[in-house]
Design a protein with these regions (language model features):
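Non-heme di-metal
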Residues: 1-150
Length: 150
């Protein structure tokens, strides 16, 4: 994973994350046993697509150089939970989704912190808040699964 030296690098990476999230939630929705959870996951696909569109719009408008570079090591700490194995059961997938949303929220917080452009800072803070809300949903779903197992 390369270091980020430009706004374009950051936005392109964030767009790829949102695309991966869409695929992740599409696949996870097929594993959901509860129809309301499957519907929520489908809604998340739509939300992640909206994030992608917002980021793409900014990418088309921006191309500035960052005052501070963001290292690949810093970013890689937040990006690990994207691929869903076909053998993953629903409980494991929900746990993975919690981790993914935590990672995305933290990544967007880091990106917001290094932005000198207020529009980009606000965009990444909003994305961070939304990803953290998604994490709360998955925490509740994971708890529900664990309680139903006992």
């Amino acid at each position: 994973m390369p270091d980020f030296y430009s706004i374009q690098d950051v936005l392109s990476f964030a767009i790829r994350l949102e695309q991966a999230s869409q695929a992740f939630y599409r696949q996870l929705s097929r594993k959901a046993h509860n129809p309301s959870v499957a519907q929520f996951l489908t809604t998340l696909v739509t939300e992640e697509k909206l994030h992608e569109v917002q980021l793409q719009r900014l990418l088309n408008e921006r191309g500035a150089i960052l005052d501070k570079s963001i290292s690949a090591e810093e970013v890689s700490r937040y990006v690990q939970a994207m691929d869903v194995s076909e053998s993953l059961d629903y409980k494991e997938a929900v746990k993975l989704a919690m981790d993914k949303e935590y990672a995305a929220g933290m990544l967007y917080s880091v990106l917001a912190a290094v932005m000198d452009d207020k529009t980009l800072e606000e965009m990444f803070l909003l994305l961070s808040t939304q990803e953290k809300a998604h994490k709360k949903f998955f925490e509740k779903e994971y708890h529900r699964i664990r309680v139903s197992e006992n």
